[in-house]
Amino acid sequence: MRNPFVRLLVLAGALLIALGVATQTSPHAATSSAARLAQLDAISDYRAKTWRWQALMSKPRTPTLYTERRSKDTTYLRWVRDLWRGRAVRAHRLAQHPPHRREWLCIHRYERHPGQGWATRTGNGYYGGLQMDISFQRTYGGELLRRKGTANRWTAAEQMWVAERAFRSGRGFYPWPNTARSCGLI
């Protein structure tokens, strides 16, 4: 009778020790997993921002092999995160300076409503600081129109890049005949 009781006691002790060890390593494993997921989220966010700015500027996407998805090395994940953060910052900086920025700002000066600026919406069928109609927005800024609504909801950079697409398509500054003339552009 003693023998089964001793065996049961030893088994219970071993089980308690095993559970104690498991609970001691569990928080570290959970923290490591949470840190990895946070890094992956940050990488994904910076990559999406980079690609969004590149798409706005009609530039090709920076390619990726998604190697971070297969890695558990936190140093490598931090490196990839910092790489994409740098790319996002550079793409954002580039997007703030469209090739004809000075010209778009001149057109904006005459097209905008004084109290509304880039968010101009006067009810005349034209939207934003460059007064784009729906057809123009659909043709040159369809993705923005779907995602954000009319041009009065777009940032100044987004409006200028959409205008830049029209310019590059061969239309030049002619969609704004009066203001472009006032600016000496046509």
Predicted regions and their residues:
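Generic intrinsically disordered, low-complexity segments enriched for polar/acidic and small residues
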Residues: 8, 43, 50, 63, ...
